Amino acid sequence: MGRIQIVYSPDENVSGRTNRPGKEVVDPRTGRIIKVKRETPDDYLNVLKPIKGPKRMEFNPYLPKTLTPKGYAKFKLMMNVASKQYETLVKRLKTERTLWEDPDFPANDKAIGNLPDFRERIEWKRPHEINPNAKFFAGGASRFDIEQGALGDCWLLAVVASISGYPQLFDQVVPKDQELKGPEYVGVVRFRFWRFGHWVEVLIDDRLPVRQGRNTLVFMHSNDPTEFWSALLEKAYAKLNGCYAHLSGGSQSEAMEDLTGGICLSLELNQKERPSDLIDQLKIYAQRCCLMGCSIDSSVMEQKMDNGLIGSHAYSLTGVYPVNYRGRTQWLMRLRNPWGDSHEWKGAWCDGSPQWREISEQEKKNINLSFTADGEFWMSYEDFVTCFSRVEVCHLGLESLEYNQNFHGKRRLDEAIFSGQWQRNVNAGGCINNRTTYWTSPQFRITVEDPDPDDDDNKCSVLIGLMQTDIRKKVGADFQPIGFMVYNAPDDLNTLLSRAQLLTRSPIAKSQFINTREVTAQFRVPPGSYVVIPSTFDPNIEVNFILRVFSQTSITEQELDEDNTNQGLPDDVIEALKLEDTLLDEDQEIEQKFLAIRDPKTNAINAVKLGELLNNSTLQDIPNFQGFNKELCRSMVASVDNNLTGHVELNEFMDLWIQAKGWKHIFIKHDVDQSGYFSAYEFREALNDAGYHVSNRLINAIINRYQDPGTDKISFEDFMLCMVRLKTAFETIEAHPKNIEGTSLFSAEDYLRFSVYI
């Protein structure tokens, strides 16, 4: 079914179309000049799609799939306000000659959070009050600048240290040209973080927590007492997460994603779960567009061990290199402790160990070997997998880097991203265990066209991440168990896989279902097309989500959907009705009843008479159905009343009668327990059985409009009301004039008349 175009004209009777709102154009049918006054463009739904260009990919996952033109206008207004927030605030503060105090993150114990040791022992001071020579940067950012404070956020420190060495990553998070003194200084600092699918700017004031009576920063700080960018960055991240306390004991993977926009994969190193080809994977990751970190599980926070390593502590994995050692290849891992001090590995290949004497000077030069107490050290692959618990790998994609930027000499990975919401009774079908509802879950098709260039097995590495909105730290809610299934896509697939198709297919890959912010899994598959189905574990759980797919080679993506079409009652339903009429002979009887009650002047009946007729027929023989009421009968009249007379003639009635019997037949099929209701999850299948195929956006509107909010079910009355209104809508659109593109053209008056008479 084509689109609808409403065109306003001076006399409200002339229809026309233009691609440019606000211009005078000539109506191709009348030759008259008309003026178009639309506020929302034809392609407004394109804002739901990611923008892929030379810059970082732009995407707003908070826009609902059900976006309307009114919603679009509100969204544009909000975006304009948000984009000017920083400039507007700075301008106001300069006019008022005041320093900003952030009302959303006040300088008090609320910002500190649940850290009892610091309650009422903190003062808040601005950088110039802590050090009169305070600067945002002192000689530029470096991974050796940063020191951890009293907060257990070494995981954040490790990632900040890692990205500080790469301007293409660091400058996105820490905007340049920020000063802590001078005519432009107003006490406002800004940072950017990637959050649930897009980059957000976080504004903070520059008041920082210091120990009472001393000018020493409590939390993250620079080893240069005049430099404050790292302390302010930590504060902005604390604001994003609710308070400083929420930064204690996090994971590197979360910080990696929030500071790069990449997607993280966790690799367990214990012997049972360790991949058999781990060293090959690490070699490839070291050569790809990736950041890597690692950690050691320990029951004691930051436990210092005899071998120089620290338990429950995050490290950066900065390199994987082979060296020739005693005639064989020895793989070495280069790591860095974010504390940047002498707490380093003390075993084989540590700084100054005898093993290095047997390595050629050229090889030492090739790997930039140096021995200083800077927290950076080397160890063998064998010791690494024995001592460490996991590796976290962050793959950088279209949201992480601009088109002309690279990382380790490698281009960013290709990326596809989808956003959605699991909605109760619509598409929150749960996992495959829920056989009657699983098929309603969102479906996305991806196509990977070429195998990986850095191996020879003719397969593609595909990394899939499913993320749910992070409300845990904001409102204390728990994450829901989420996961996804991957299926081979039929060659001709352009619409949703049906319930029957899904229940007879086996997934080629699947993730675990875990109650974490994000679930990721990596697969190696031949080039081709695949269907990814994300879901919660249980049905009827409402959560916003984004689904991301990364690959070294190009990806094409499509949200699977149906076109809005009316194909009429299927042949099997028509045949069933013929058989039924042979047995009951009701068609002739109902025709005689119509003739008996018609108005002799018009040979037609109104909605009241229609109700009397239908309530004395077999159509009303449905459990718990209270009969054809006035509202339902009015809509039934409207569905066949082509000239808006408010009456139904005999031929119109008989057409409606046949269709109504077909709709009743379909309702009974889905009302398996003969209760007079069926589940809202079955509505789409019932519509398909009636010949109506509707899009994801339309089924959402239908279910929200016609389900019983108390039972989450569809009654016979609401089902019939939906059927007749869909009939009216489809036939109105099909009958209306169209342009060369198949878009239906409505004047404002026509649209309003059909909207109210339905």
Curated annotation (Swiss-Prot):
Q: Where is the active site?
A: 154, 313, 337
Q: Provide the E.C. number(s) assigned to this enzyme.
A: 3.4.22.-
* Regulation of activity: Activated by free cytoplasmic calcium.
Q: Which domain of life is it from?
A: Eukaryota
Q: Which PROSITE patterns match?
A: CALPAIN_CAT, EF_HAND_2, THIOL_PROTEASE_CYS
Annotated EF-hand domain residues: 658-693, 694-729
| Segments for region (Linker) | 563-582
An example of a Gene Ontology cellular component annotation for this protein is:
cytoplasm
Q: What is this protein called?
A: Calpain
Record organism:
Schistosoma mansoni
